[in-house]
UniProtKB/Swiss-Prot annotation:
This is Multidrug resistance protein MdtH. Pfam families: MFS_1. The keyword Transmembrane applies. It is found in: Cell inner membrane. One of its GO terms (molecular function) is transmembrane transporter activity. Gene3D superfamilies: MFS general substrate transporter like domains. It comes from Pectobacterium carotovorum subsp. carotovorum (strain PC1). It is a multi-pass membrane protein.
């Protein structure tokens, strides 16, 4: 077997193992943050939303710098350092009894993600052939869903003993992931050339089409991040027990494991990437409107099911579309910048969603945040339609050295 083919084959298995640990470590802790601090300790949802939004904004908003540094120095040192930083964030979260401590822990967690996320994404592009990426992203999403359920189940079980144990468990998993990367990951260069940091940044910023696409996705992410904030709070409120949150993630896992790969295989032969992205976003947006008026757990879970179906359709297409638009000479920079929409959408979605949730309850209008989210989804859909109705999707190749 040629050396590159062997590297690709082994690389797939390593990427899947690494991804499983990262997803597991994240979902042991993060789905329980809103339950712990809002429902158990009685903090305002806005305070917790700021913490979650801060993590999202730091991780994704600074991702272009993490990606540019990885373009220059390689993936391995950035990934290991980032994972250890996230572990330290979870340690601080274990002792958080004031908002500033929670914010600090989320900031450290986000900074860790800034360092390890772009090079990990760029490794997928490097090791997976273009014609196989859509299916591989679907496999990663299926794994994400299974890992989310297993992580949430472990976290929910540990929460009955102590939230500190939950956080320490997440920290140990990320230390293990860092050790695995230190031991097994070769010193890959993730770009086709050793791009200087400023050149990689400049190349992305000059790509107006990619810039517009990334910023448009802000609205998409404002909906997507509610899986970690308002949806768990809503499930807990209606069910009356935090243990019900695991059913939300069980639904996601069941749908992903049964539908995600078949839908991706079927749709990639019949529809363009942007059409699949917009169809998924449409379903996600429609599911938002009735949630605030729901009083039965069964109805809420059905709406969450609809939301997840939209996500299953949209997410592989979004990831593949981002990869197809990236310039191979600065993959890390492109993949880092592609997270800017998630940074903005996450920051606004978490803090704005938390504020709207508190305001809706204070005004006795619990449907307010969900109506606003649905509206934002449709506005984003219109922007995507306008953008892709007049542009062909090809990788950017800009001049310069």
């Amino acid at each position: 077997m040629p050396l590159m083919s062997q590297a690709r084959s082994l690389g797939k298995y390593f990427l899947l193992l690494d991804n499983m640990l990262v997803v597991l470590g994240f979902f042991v802790v993060f789905p329980l943050i809103s339950i712990r601090f809002v429902d158990d300790l009685g903090w305002a949802a806005l305070l917790v939303g700021i913490a979650l939004g801060l993590r999202q904004f730091i991780q994704q908003g600074l991702g272009i710098f993490g990606g540019a540094i990885a373009d220059r120095f390689g993936a391995k040192p950035m990934i290991i350092t980032g994972m250890l930083l996230r572990a330290s964030g979870f340690v601080f979260m274990a002792i958080a009894d004031e908002p500033w401590l929670l914010w600090l822990s989320c900031a450290l967690s986000g900074l860790g993600g800034t360092l390890f996320d772009p090079p990990r994404t760029a490794l997928v592009i490097k090791l997976i052939r273009p014609q196989e990426r859509g299916r591989f992203y679907s496999l990663l999403m299926m794994q994400d869903s299974a890992g989310a359920v297993i992580g949430a189940l472990i976290g929910s079980w540990l929460l009955q003993y102590d939230f500190e144990i939950v956080c320490w468990t997440g920290a140990v998993i990320f230390v293990l992931a860092a050790a695995l990367n230190a031991w097994l990951l070769p010193a890959y260069r993730i770009s086709t050339v050793k791009t200087p940091i400023l050149e990689g940044l400049t190349r992305v910023i000059r790509d107006r089409r990619f810039l517009m696409y990334v910023l448009t996705l802000t609205g998409y992410y404002m909906l997507a991040v509610q899986v970690l904030l308002m949806l768990p709070i809503m499930v807990n409120e209606i069910a009356g027990t935090p243990s019900a949150v695991k059913w939300m993630y069980a639904i996601e896992a069941a749908l992903s494991l049964t539908l995600l790969y078949p839908i991706a295989r079927w749709s990639e032969k019949r529809f363009r990437l942007e059409q699949r992205l917009m169809a998924g976003l449409f379903i996600m947006s429609v599911s938002m409107f009735p949630i605030g008026m729901t009083t039965e757990l069964q109805t809420l879970l059905m709406l969450i099911c609809l939301f997840y179906i939209g996500s299953i359709i949209a997410e592989p297409a979004r990831e593949t579309l981002s990869a197809s638009l990236a310039d191979a000479r600065a993959r890390g920079s492109y993949m880092g910048f592609s997270r800017l929409g998630l940074a903005l959408g996450g920051a606004i979605g978490y803090s704005g969603g938390g504020w709207l949730f508190d305001t809706g309850h204070a005004l006795n209008q619990p449907e307010l945040p969900w109506f606003m989210l649905g509206t934002i989804g449709f506005l984003t859909l219109a922007a995507l339609y306008w953008q892709f109705n007049q542009r062909r999707i090809e990788p950017a190749m800009l001049g310069g050295h």
